[in-house]
């Protein structure tokens, strides 16, 4: 039987969501002005199937050969460095506008005689000051495989785009009684610096009498500060814009006397331009701060694209606190 690969990349964000309204209008008009999303866990699933109608068959169908072939395939995914480039992300003036990825539903496998689905998660926990990757057998349908080789390696970089170096290898082999739904492993890293992080996962599954095959997926970069706190994802539901991300994780501090100034005139000019561009949201602007995506402290400027309006409590209690640990 030929092993058929069907790679399902399911991005699941476990989010703490707070919706803030702040205009002096009615309650209905205040709601949904801004959405603050704080990702905690990012998950992907990989599903490998074996088709009962497959025509190809391994000439060495004993378990030892299947396991050996699976290990060889797993070793081919060993990369000390990976390169990331998102053609839809707009990077300009030290900030990156990253398009929001919509959640995709997992596809069914009506012709699959047997399948195994693996769950790969990356957990950012600022309380433990850790970043953890996990590997878990999510489901098994039909005959269980005799071997599963799985890995969920962590990579980091100082830039959103470009080369990422491996932080650690997290590889696991499932054999015999370990091949059961719910069996999982985890590995943690305790960052000391702000970085962009990516995880790359690989699954190799082999059934008796089949040729093992492999499936690989990579999670898009996520910016986390030195305590593992993910950069907040905030959407302005009036302008339909999501707050950009700083393009680097290692911007140096600019001396106070060298920083660009921010005055009440600059603030007024921004508000006028915002209304001209997006229309009047009828907000109580006195209750808002205008946030610099790249702060003046790190070389940010007063250009329109580097500015983002925020309720004062979010600006001071979320963004400023995040940057305190940059």
What are these regions (language model features)?
Residues 1-2, 208:
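Accessible peptide chain termini
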Residues 2-25:
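Sec-dependent N-terminal signal peptides of Gram-positive bacterial secreted proteins and lipoproteins
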Residues 28, 33-289, 297-326:
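Nuclease and nuclease-like effector domains acting on nucleic acids or nucleotide cofactors
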């Amino acid at each position: 039987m030929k092993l058929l690969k069907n790679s399902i990349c399911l991005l699941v964000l476990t989010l703490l969501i707070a919706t803030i309204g702040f205009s002096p209008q009615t309650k209905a008009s205040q709601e949904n002005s801004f959405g603050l999303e704080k990702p905690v866990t990012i998950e992907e699933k990989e599903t490998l199937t074996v088709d009962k109608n497959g025509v190809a068959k391994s000439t060495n169908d004993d378990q030892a050969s299947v396991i050996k072939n699976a290990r060889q395939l797993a070793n081919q995914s060993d990369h000390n460095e990976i390169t990331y480039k998102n053609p839809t992300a707009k990077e300009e003036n030290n900030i990156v506008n990253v398009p929001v990825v919509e959640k995709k539903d997992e596809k069914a496998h009506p012709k699959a005689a047997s399948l195994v689905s693996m769950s790969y998660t990356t957990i950012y926990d600022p309380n433990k000051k850790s970043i953890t990757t996990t590997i878990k057998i999510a489901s098994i349908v039909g005959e269980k495989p005799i071997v599963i080789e799985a890995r969920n390696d962590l990579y980091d970089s100082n830039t959103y785009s470009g080369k990422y170096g491996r932080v650690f290898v997290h590889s696991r082999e499932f054999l015999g009684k370990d091949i059961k739904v719910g069996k999982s492993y985890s590995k943690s890293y305790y960052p000391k610096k702000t970085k962009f992080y990516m995880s790359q996962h690989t699954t190799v599954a082999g059934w008796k009498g089949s040729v093992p095959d492999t499936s690989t997926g990579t999670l898009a970069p996520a910016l986390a500060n030195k305590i593992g706190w993910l950069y907040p994802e905030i959407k302005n539901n009036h302008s339909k814009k999501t707050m950009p991300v700083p393009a680097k994780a290692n911007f140096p501090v600019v001396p106070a006397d060298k920083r660009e100034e921010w005055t009440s005139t600059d603030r007024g000019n921004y508000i006028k331009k915002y209304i001209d561009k997006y229309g009047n949201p009828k907000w109580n602007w006195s209750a808002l701060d205008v946030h610099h995506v790249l702060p003046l402290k790190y070389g940010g400027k007063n250009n329109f694209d580097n500015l983002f309006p925020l309720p004062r409590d979010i600006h001071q209690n979320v963004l400023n606190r995040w940057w305190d640990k940059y």
